[in-house]
């Protein structure tokens, strides 16, 4: 039996992006599908195009499958519906129409993925307008592994790993032709589990009140480096900063399972809430905010008695802390004896 497999989209015509990036992840899954199908004696052709525009991307994959005279076409995707979603959305498959061989493959694939991962089963849906389904000359199935923005889905996907998903898709195909899969069941993705644990170790000290752009520079003329969601926790860096409306920070990049490189965020109180862990005490008038931990430092600003701030660290007799100035949050040095930690 001849099967054509492709990963959806490419890095010039990218797919969905949420907590994970569709194009990055479907590349992992489709390769795992191919590996398991070959191990089970199927003749497999990788019909994933290289980087190109979306129309070329779709046509090249379908043309390769048709020229191969494949008996089955499978395209791997990840879905997206919302900007952010905490609950489960699930796994599903698409076919051109019901009642044919494609539906049998699609049903077995989605059932096997759901049973093997606990992802919600969305079943088989039809869409005769999708290019991959209406231009192929063999039974064709689009697999939507899970939703990129669903925290529940992504947590499950990360725990189970792309190798298991690929195995389960191959198992569903085998079941459709009354064949028992002979590949070994992959173990839980220990690497991704470790990365998720690292996410739990990522120390934060601020909350985005609204969705924020991670910026490559502290200005309104910037490159958007990703997405910080409303209510997402981030880390304001322990660096002196007197820039109006901006602070250096990092955030957790779910698609890469790691802390981001330093970026800039809007520091206005209307969009950002920095934690507090200390109180200004015993100050009669004002406590100077300084650029350096020295009595000779120029003054950046000031805080008053009983004001709250976030202390990053204390060195000798000075505390580096983020405080709320009139324009937004800033970070400066303060004389530590006038600051009481919680």
Curated annotation (Swiss-Prot):
CDD domains assigned: MurNAc-LAA
Instruction: Give the family this protein belongs to, as stated in its UniProt record.
Output: To C.perfringens CPE1502.
GO cellular component terms, A-Z: outer membrane-bounded periplasmic space
Does this entry carry the keyword Nucleus?
A: no
Which species is listed as the source? Clostridium perfringens
What residue stretch is flagged as signal peptide?
A: none
Q: Which domain of life is it from?
A: Bacteria
What's a single GO BP term from this record? peptidoglycan catabolic process
Ranges of residues in domain MurNAc-LAA: 3-173
The name under which this protein is listed is Uncharacterized 38.4 kDa protein
Per UniProt, which keywords does this protein have? Plasmid
Which Pfam families would you find in this protein's record? Amidase_3
Please give the InterPro entries that the UniProt record associates with this protein.
MurNAc-LAA_cat, N-acetylmuramoyl_amidase_3
- In its keyword annotation, does this UniProt entry include Glycoprotein? no
What GO MF terms are annotated?
Answer: N-acetylmuramoyl-L-alanine amidase activity
